[in-house]
Amino acid sequence: MSVTRDDVRKVARLSRIAVPEERLDELAGELNGILGWIDQLNEVDVEGVEPMTSVVETKLPMRDDVVTDGNIQDQVLANAPRSEHGFFVVPKAVE
């Protein structure tokens, strides 16, 4: 699979990122390089290797799952440009 200028343009549009036309070829090359590295993982022989989540066996202590409201709603909403009735108000993203 090869990433083209059109692919970069489409991903940029979907991500709502402004990418100048003169950077499309450069970014396509970078993405193709990244995908090439990822494709190399398909060449690794993992036959007989047990799946793992980490190479280090670490036991993490569990805490009680207690629901709280945080008691800082006013502080959190103070950072928001807009809020109503204790909730964030954000611009509509999907039409």
Swiss-Prot record:
Q: Which GO terms describe its biological process?
A: glutaminyl-tRNAGln biosynthesis via transamidation; regulation of translational fidelity; translation
Subunit structure, briefly?
Answer: Heterotrimer of A, B and C subunits.
One matching Pfam family: GatC
Write the record's keywords in alphabetical order, separated by commas: ATP-binding, Ligase, Nucleotide-binding, Protein biosynthesis
The protein's job, in short, is: Allows the formation of correctly charged Asn-tRNA(Asn) or Gln-tRNA(Gln) through the transamidation of misacylated Asp-tRNA(Asn) or Glu-tRNA(Gln) in organisms which lack either or both of asparaginyl-tRNA or glutaminyl-tRNA synthetases. The reaction takes place in the presence of glutamine and ATP through an activated phospho-Asp-tRNA(Asn) or phospho-Glu-tRNA(Gln).
Originating gene: gatC
Its recorded reaction(s) are: L-glutamyl-tRNA(Gln) + L-glutamine + ATP + H2O = L-glutaminyl-tRNA(Gln) + L-glutamate + ADP + phosphate + H(+); L-aspartyl-tRNA(Asn) + L-glutamine + ATP + H2O = L-asparaginyl-tRNA(Asn) + L-glutamate + ADP + phosphate + 2 H(+)
- Which NCBIfam families does the annotation name? gatC
Q: What is this protein called?
A: Aspartyl/glutamyl-tRNA(Asn/Gln) amidotransferase subunit C
